[in-house]
Amino acid sequence: MNKHKNRKYVLRRGVFILPTLCTIGTIFCGFYSITSVMRGEFNQAALAIGIAVVFDGMDGRIARLTNSSSEFGVQIDSLADVATFGIAPALLAYYWGLGNLQAIQSFSQHLEQLGWVICFGYLVCGAMRLARFNTQSESSKSAPKYSEKRFVGMPIPAGAGLIAATVHYNPEPISCWAIGVGWMVIISFLSFLMVSTIRYPSFKYFDFKKRNRYINVAFLGLAIALIHQYSEVVLLILAVSYVSSGLFVRFISMFKTTNGSLLTPDTFDLNDE
């Protein structure tokens, strides 16, 4: 009897550790990405961030499935996100985008300084996004289920994923100053999206057991196969699609609101003539 109890205790402890191991995997990927950037291995750094996105999606899901969520897990996950999806992609964006520019020395120097500020701003916006998410999670535990299916502001892994996917698509660092300027505009826009109030879909409660589970599994298998064969293109398309999804939904809602205010009964009042 005691052996059975000890076995159940060990099993529970093991289940509790699983989400933390995934979070540690996220931290490892972030550290590996940073060291790869320092060595000039930009594609390796990008791949590490991509793997970290997978780990980040697994830890919370495992914690919910095993009922092993804890305040410790929430805090270490936030710290891991700052390092892996804040510091690592900011360094990658800076060194890949501005570390090899071919331009007049004085102009190139000013551009690098501006890029440094922009990449630091990305890190700050990412940290603010995580802080806002944590405070909203605490205050909305009794909120309707709808709030759990939407993020307020673009999640920081999405911004990091787009940076990593772009570098993975073209690992050669940017040399043209005009493209470097465009890259800094993109980083600035990602920073804005993280601290904005634009809603983004959350896949935290995506359930494969629903009625379309076979179709979902088939699509997942197809996506894995496509990523294996055409990772550069597919990952970039996925990253751009998610980042654009919030903007698309916001645009549609604004369009409907505008049309709703224009197409009132007074609009078609024929007594004005």
Label the predicted regions.
Residues 28, 54, 58, 62, ...:
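Active-site His/Glu-centered metal-binding helix of metallohydrolases
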Residues 118-156:
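Hydrophobic, well-structured mid-protein blocks that either form specific transmembrane helices
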Residues 32-47, 90-120, 166-183, 229-233:
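Helix-coil boundary and interhelical linker segments in multi-pass alpha-helical membrane proteins
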Residues 31-34, 51, 55, 89, ...:
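Alpha-helical transmembrane segments of polytopic integral membrane proteins
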Residues 18-24, 65-133:
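Multi-pass membrane catalytic core of lipid/isoprenoid biosynthesis enzymes
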Residues 61-71, 127-142, 195-204:
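C-terminal ends of transmembrane helices
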Residues 1-7, 141-273:
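C-terminal membrane-associated helical module and adjoining short loops/tails
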Residues 1-57, 238, 249-250, 259, ...:
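Topogenic membrane-insertion module of multi-pass membrane proteins
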